[in-house]
């Protein structure tokens, strides 16, 4: 079994009889309206002959994993395989962008693709519709975690499916996030410190999970992207986007002793011989150690593409923007009463540009939409240009796709994450939100006992109230416990969540208990 790394999250897995591509992303228009580009450039793969493919896989709906141009160029005989999520958003997105119908694979069954035995897991909470794929032959196995977080119980079931430790695990070291990059409540120093803390939390998760997998090879995959639009070029230096070499060095310094690879497009790992054949051609012009000049040249090269994307959006006709905005959110209010109640906040949309306006959107048990007035109170604020609002209202651009472009500013008070606000904006779908509601209402009654740094004992819920991860692996600092999966932090004495709208049941035990 061989794995060719295609850049970003893309891989090509081949055996003597089977060849598949997963999450190939090669086009010169990047992703998220030209805000993300492949790093380093891998556009040469678009011209490759892929006629011998047995299948292509798209793990989830983010556009750095779903390349419509690549999928459209493929022969109709090559099936497009996707996980069967609670929502049909991924299916409909591929069908709309490519005029091809993907095949949904169930999560309950194993699937044979040529001589590759494949099984799919998804994140335990349906709030995050991302997937983990395992491929195995009689001799070798690969776990591709893509952008997903994997729980302790899932690691156990994956290793049971394989029958031991995997040969290769692919994990993301960088983030796909706009926090804290786009948030205005921080000065530059505070924002940098928040980013560093977030990077450390992510890499600690990678270290813990990679150690549990105990694979022969670990590949740091799926990012970071290059931000080539001049208006967001600054984000290339944000600590939340470490490159694979930075992540590799961090893990090695923390004592991870297995083989780690910081790959580039064209590198091929042969699991039979345990050798990595590097693409030396691409290394003539690019190095993970320093690519400052590379990014400047890359930005200049792609500028015409980015300008063209923006011009097309500018040309979108838009009348009655206020009515379209009102219709958009009043439909969203009817998607899920549960989400409205869990959000329970007022959002201010401050949109500049020729088709702009100012609006208040209240999500609660009695939601409402109105034009902004000077004395209106709000908890959250989004500011951006009206060209992007046209993409959302007229072309159904998902809010999450827009947020990932970093072309906005945000502010919130209190400064805590509201998972349900993002969930409703990104899904806007009854099936998806209902799956989350069922998951969150079916919480376990199991408890565990933990001890703080002072020796006090607390009985707490065994599973994190956010996404159901076991808190047995939680990190305890002073009177706080941090979930190792998504880094929600809880006060053991009160149960309050310090960084999100999500509380933990906690009870202090007597010393004799």
Identify what each model region corresponds to.
Residues 1-43, 121, 426-449:
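Zn-dependent metallo-beta-lactamase
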Residues 10-16, 110-166, 463:
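Catalytic core of the metallo-beta-lactamase
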Residues 18-58, 68-73, 84, 150-164, ...:
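Pre-active-site segment of Zn-dependent metallo-hydrolases
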Residues 21-23, 52-64, 81-85, 143-149, ...:
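Active-site neighborhood of phospho(di)ester-bond hydrolases with catalytic His/Asp-centered motifs
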Residues 42-109, 477-509:
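Active-site HxH/HxHxD metal-binding segment of metal-dependent hydrolases
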Residues 82-140, 246-249, 261-262, 443-446, ...:
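Metallo-beta-lactamase
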Residues 153-254:
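Cap/insert and terminal regions of metallo-dependent hydrolase folds
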Residues 269-463, 471-473, 481:
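Feature captures hydrophobic
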């Amino acid at each position: 079994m061989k794995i060719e790394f295609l850049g970003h999250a893309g891989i090509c897995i081949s055996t003597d009889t089977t060849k598949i591509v997963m999450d190939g992303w090669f086009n010169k228009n990047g992703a998220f309206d030209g805000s993300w580009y492949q790093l380093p450039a891998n556009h040469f793969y678009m011209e490759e002959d892929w006629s011998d493919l047995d299948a292509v896989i798209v793990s989830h709906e983010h556009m750095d994993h779903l390349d419509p141009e690549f999928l459209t160029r493929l022969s109709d005989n090559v099936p497009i395989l996707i996980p069967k999520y609670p929502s049909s958003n991924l299916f409909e997105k591929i069908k709309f962008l490519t005029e091809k119908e993907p095949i949904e694979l169930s999560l309950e069954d194993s699937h044979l693709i040529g001589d590759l035995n494949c099984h799919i897991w998804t994140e335990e909470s349906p709030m995050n519709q991302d997937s983990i794929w395992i491929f195995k032959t009689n001799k070798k196995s690969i776990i591709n975690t893509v952008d997903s977080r994997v729980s302790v119980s899932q690691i156990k079931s994956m290793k049971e499916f394989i029958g031991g430790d995997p040969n290769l695990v692919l994990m993301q070291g960088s983030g796909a996030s706009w926090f804290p990059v786009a948030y205005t409540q921080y000065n530059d120093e505070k924002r940098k410190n928040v980013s560093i803390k977030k990077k450390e939390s992510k890499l600690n998760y990678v270290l813990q999970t990679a150690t549990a997998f105990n694979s022969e090879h670990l590949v740091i995959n799926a990012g970071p992207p290059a931000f080539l639009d001049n208006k967001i070029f600054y984000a290339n230096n944000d600590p939340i986007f470490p490159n694979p070499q930075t992540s590799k060095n961090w893990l090695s310094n923390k004592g991870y002793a297995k083989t780690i690879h910081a790959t580039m497009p064209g590198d091929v790992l042969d699991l039979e011989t345990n050798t990595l054949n590097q693409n030396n051609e691409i290394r003539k012009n690019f190095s993970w150690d320093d690519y400052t000049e590379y990014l400047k040249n890359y930005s200049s090269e792609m500028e015409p593409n980015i300008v063209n994307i923006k011009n097309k959006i500018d040309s979108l006709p838009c009348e009655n923007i206020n009515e379209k905005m009102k219709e958009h959110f009043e439909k969203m209010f009817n998607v899920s009463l549960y989400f409205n109640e869990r959000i329970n906040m007022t959002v201010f949309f401050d949109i500049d540009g020729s088709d702009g306006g100012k609006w208040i959107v209240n999500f609660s048990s009695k939601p409402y939409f109105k034009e902004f007035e000077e004395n209106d109170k709000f908890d959250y604020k989004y500011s951006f240009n009206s060209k992007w609002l046209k993409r959302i209202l007229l072309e159904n651009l998902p809010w999450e796709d827009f947020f990932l472009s970093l072309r906005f500013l945000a502010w919130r008070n209190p400064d805590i994450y509201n998972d349900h606000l993002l969930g409703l904006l990104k899904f806007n779908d009854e099936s998806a939100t209902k799956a989350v509601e069922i998951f969150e209402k079916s919480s376990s009654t199991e408890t565990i006992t933990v001890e703080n740094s002072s020796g006090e004992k607390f009985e707490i819920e065994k599973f994190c109230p956010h996404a159901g991860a076991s808190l047995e692996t939680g990190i305890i600092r002073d009177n706080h416990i941090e979930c190792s999966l998504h880094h929600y932090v809880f006060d053991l004495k009160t149960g309050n969540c310090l960084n999100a709208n999500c509380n933990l049941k906690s009870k202090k035990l007597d010393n004799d208990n």
